[in-house]
């Protein structure tokens, strides 16, 4: 019985070993044929992927056409608005302030009454001077009559020559006194006139510096009120010294250089004026020169000490080739654009740029009017690649929001 069991275990072990050997031999014999099949399948998949890339959708881009325009050249600088004239109104006589005839902040004209000093003392002084003048005029008239009689009597030797000369001297002396009296009358009249304080220039009055009832003096430095002349008004801005020659040449050519004032953010045009003058020296610390422009400012858009951005038109480039600023790229070789041919294949082209702003760039060399350039999707481009030109998508917000420089033509230098 025991021998029978041992025999059965031996047979079972032999079957297992034979099965394992058969499996090992079979797997080794199939491996050389299976590997080429897997490799072929991988190559087929890769080839299919490459065919899918070639036959897939083209890279979408947006494009614009180079056009010719008349492009103005601007010189830009930072500036401050200043009053054409600033006058501190002071009293020229001493006395009590009895009235103010202006509202703070109002516009006044030259000659308008601003304040009144008590005129009583000046009227009294004028009356005294006029009385003295009248008295001396009477004295002169009497002295002249006596002189006429002395001259008649001297002919008959009834009066001496000495008496005649004395009477003539009296007349001359009285005439001198009358001239002094007339000057006193004029001075008293002037003092009375000065008690009425009028505006020396047209402009906007500021806040009052003194209240009615105060005793004021001609030596008061604060004055009564300050007037700033804002019609017209000036703008002082700076330009680099390298721009001086351009401005001087334009002036010598007889051009009236237009200056625009833009707000602090450089997004809204405030007013337009003309160049008035250049300073006579360059600031050595900054290498800039001061420029003064004048504006009529009838709409009061400019105020003294207001900070603005100034742009001065110095020239206009006719028939300039212009493309959107987004089309111009910068690389190691310099500025370039991606140009589209008739089959929508792109190629890189070096260009030389001129006048530019945040929207447009003048191409001074490298492009012609009518050339199409890529403005969006540039990062997906390679030399010779074919692309799909799509129209830009406009959102409702874009349709409702005007351009920051709507109505602005040309570019800034």
From Swiss-Prot:
Spell out the residue ranges making up region: Disordered.
31-57, 391-413
Q: What GO molecular function annotation could you give as one example from this UniProt entry?
A: efflux transmembrane transporter activity
Tell me the membrane topology, using the record's own terms: Peripheral membrane protein
- Cell compartment(s), UniProt: Cell inner membrane
Which UniProt keywords are listed?
A: Cell inner membrane, Cell membrane, Membrane, Signal, Transport
The superkingdom listed in its UniProt entry is Bacteria
**Would the keyword Cell membrane turn up in this protein's UniProt record?**
yes
| InterPro entries on file | CusB_D23, Multidrug-R_MdtA, RND_pump_MFP
Q: Name one GO cellular component term.
A: plasma membrane
**Coarse class of the protein's main subcellular location:** membrane
Residue ranges under compositional bias (Low complexity)? 32-49
Signal peptide positions are 1-20
| Comp. bias regions, Basic and acidic residues | 397-413
Kindly give the NCBIfam families that the UniProt entry links to this protein. PRK11556.1, RND_mfp
What HAMAP family does the record point to? MdtA
**PANTHER family xref list:** MULTIDRUG RESISTANCE PROTEIN MDTA (PTHR30469:SF12)
Subunit notes for this chain? Part of a tripartite efflux system composed of MdtA, MdtB and MdtC.
Which family does the record claim for this protein?
Answer: Belongs to the membrane fusion protein (MFP) (TC 8.A.1) family.
From the Swiss-Prot or TrEMBL record, give the protein name.
Answer: Multidrug resistance protein MdtA
**Which organism does this record belong to?**
Salmonella typhi
């Amino acid at each position: 019985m025991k021998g029978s069991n041992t025999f059965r275990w031996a047979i079972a072990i032999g079957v297992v070993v034979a099965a394992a050997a058969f499996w090992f031999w079979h797997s080794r014999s199939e491996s050389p044929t299976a590997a080429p099949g897997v490799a072929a399948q991988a190559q087929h998949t890769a080839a299919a992927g490459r065919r899918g890339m070639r036959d897939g959708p083209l890279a979408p881009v947006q494009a614009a056409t180079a056009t010719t325009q008349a492009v103005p050249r601007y010189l830009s600088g930072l500036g401050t608005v200043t009053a054409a004239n600033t006058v501190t109104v002071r009293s020229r006589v001493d006395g009590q302030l009895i009235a103010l005839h202006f509202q703070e902040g109002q516009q006044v004209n030259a000659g308008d009454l601003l304040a009144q000093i008590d005129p009583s003392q000046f009227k009294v002084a004028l009356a005294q001077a006029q009385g003295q003048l009248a008295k001396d005029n009477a004295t002169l008239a009497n002295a002249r009559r006596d002189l006429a009689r002395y001259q008649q009597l001297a002919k008959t030797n009834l009066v001496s020559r000495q008496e005649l000369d004395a009477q003539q001297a009296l007349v001359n002396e009285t005439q001198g006194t009358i001239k002094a009296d007339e000057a006193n009358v004029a001075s008293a009249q002037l003092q009375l006139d000065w008690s009425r304080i009028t505006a020396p220039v047209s402009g906007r009055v500021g806040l009052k510096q003194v209240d009615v009832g105060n005793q004021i003096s001609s030596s008061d430095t604060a004055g009564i009120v300050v007037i700033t002349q804002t019609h017209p008004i000036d703008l002082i801005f700076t330009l680099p010294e390298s721009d001086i020659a351009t401005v001087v040449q334009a002036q010598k050519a007889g051009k009236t250089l237009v200056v625009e004032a833009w707000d602090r953010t450089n997004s809204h045009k405030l007013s337009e004026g003309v160049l008035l003058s250049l300073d006579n020296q360059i600031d050595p610390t900054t290498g800039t020169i001061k420029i003064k422009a004048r504006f009529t400012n009838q709409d009061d858009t400019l105020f003294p000490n207001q900070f603005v951005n100034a742009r001065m038109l110095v020239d206009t480039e006719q028939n300039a080739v212009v493309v959107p600023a987004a089309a111009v790229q910068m690389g190691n070789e310099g500025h370039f654009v991606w140009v589209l041919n008739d089959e929508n294949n792109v190629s890189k082209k070096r260009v030389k740029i001129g006048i530019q702003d945040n929207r447009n760039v003048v191409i001074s060399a490298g492009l012609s009017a009518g050339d199409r350039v890529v403005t969006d999707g540039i990062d997906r481009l390679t030399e010779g690649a074919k692309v799909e030109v799509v129209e830009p998508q406009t959102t409702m917000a874009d349709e409702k929001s005007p351009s920051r420089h709507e109505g602005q033509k040309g570019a800034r230098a």
